[in-house]
């Protein structure tokens, strides 16, 4: 019995250690981008029959030169990078990260500026959608002396007074979103 108690304590201690985040080390020249979870981080995404699911936002982080020209995507959430939306009914969620999509300037066969299931972004720049605050480490090449880190954070179907659900395509407050 005593041996079983010690084993349980040992397993509990091991589980505590295994849940800690990996320590990120920074060197001279590295840039730390810290995204802080705010009050509205989780959004009620409508599923059906008035049932909602709490969803974190879609996020894109990219570099631009000092004139505002797109250079490279550093990080983008997995769902938009691979079009792996749940229960979307084929809706590609063009309203999710419109600034990043148009900044990249890559137009796909269907006329939209966001990745497709057939042409997803590479795994190296996409990652799971963070459910809270997180850090990104940038290690710019020596050739890149000055740049702007641009971040877009948005919720699909987050209709509000500025971008109402009933706005029609062509109107200035149309978000492109559909439930």
Task: Locate the predicted segments by residue.
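Exposed beta-strand and adjacent loop surfaces of beta-rich binding modules
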Residues: 30, 56-60, 146-148
